Amino acid sequence: EKNMRILLIVTLMLSFTAYAQEESSREFADGVIELTTVKVKTNFLQDYLDGIEKTWVAAAKIQKEMGIISDYNVYIGNDGSTVYLTTAYPSWANKAPWSEEQTAEFQEKFRKTISQEDNVELSQSYEDIREIVSVELIGRLVFK
């Protein structure tokens, strides 16, 4: 009986030691990235990029200054008609709805870059030249 106890204790100790030494070779990085895939009609890429520079990029710059996002990027696919928009949030909490103060601050700053009428007009013109294919939240893996 005593030998069985010793054997059981040794077995448990070895299994805990082996389990404690196991370490994952990868982990998720902090934050989350919103990836939007946009298909732009042929010959309208420049028009689309000109438009988002005044709207989406301007808004992203303000959000970055406010600390809501940590980065943003625009990528063009090799087909010349697919655009990838990325918005990096430093944490999932930053993806949450904005407070009234944040909304007011953003609107005040954004109105200095483009009028409400111009923003609506540009945004509506996108409907004719692009299709949003997908919006995904993706995480970045870090390999150790």
Regions found by a protein language model. Give the residues of each.
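An amphipathic, aromatic/His-enriched active-site/gating alpha helix that lines ligand/cofactor pockets
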Residues: 62-70, 88-136
